[in-house]
């Protein structure tokens, strides 16, 4: 009787382990899984961007880039992001061999809190 209770748990762990090893193998330079010919990358939330009509991981795009002009979000300083108009912060990747960073828009919490406190409260 106890083996019937343990069987679903064993099946769950087997499936979880197989998914984990599948995801680990596809993380390197493999595309994120979709094309971006007509629509942007759906997997943008997990770090994918469009390059040559295929969605790739952001760190792969930065590692393979020859110049900053290869992708509109590549940067080497905050000023590059501001002049390109793609954000105001250039974040570098943890890998030391990637010489370009990635632009994104960043707002400090203190700035937003200051604006929130300026709002008038209706009586």
Curated annotation (Swiss-Prot):
Propeptide per record: which residue ranges? 59-123
Signal peptide start-end: 1-28
Keywords recorded for this protein, A-Z: Disulfide bond, Knottin, Plant defense, Signal
Report the Pfam families cross-referenced here.
Albumin_I_a, Cyclotide
What GO biological process, any one, is recorded here?
A: defense response
PTM per Swiss-Prot/TrEMBL: Contains 3 disulfide bonds.
State where the record puts the cross-link Cyclopeptide (Gly-Asp). Answer: 29-58
Q: Which PROSITE patterns match?
A: CYCLOTIDE (PS51052), CYCLOTIDE_BRACELET (PS60008)
Using the chain's own numbering, where are the disulfide bonds?
Answer: 32-48, 36-50, 41-55
Its biological purpose: Probably participates in a plant defense mechanism.
Tell me the protein family, please: Belongs to the cyclotide family. Bracelet subfamily.
Q: What is known of its domains?
A: The presence of a 'disulfide through disulfide knot' structurally defines this protein as a knottin.
Provide the protein name. Answer: Cliotide T12
Species of provenance: Clitoria ternatea
């Amino acid at each position: 009787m106890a083996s019937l209770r343990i069987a679903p748990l064993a099946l769950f762990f087997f499936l979880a382990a197989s998914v984990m090893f599948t995801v680990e193998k596809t993380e390197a330079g493999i595309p994120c899984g979709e094309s971006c010919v007509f629509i942007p990358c759906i997997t943008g939330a997990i770090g994918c961007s469009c390059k040559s009509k295929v969605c790739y991981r952001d760190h792969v795009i930065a590692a393979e880039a020859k110049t900053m002009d290869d992708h509109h979000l590549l940067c080497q300083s905050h000023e590059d992001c501001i002049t390109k108009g793609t954000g105001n912060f250039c974040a570098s990747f943890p890998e030391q061999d990637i010489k370009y960073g990635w632009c994104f828009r960043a707002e400090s919490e203190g700035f937003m809190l200051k604006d929130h406190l300026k709002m008038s409260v209706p009586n």
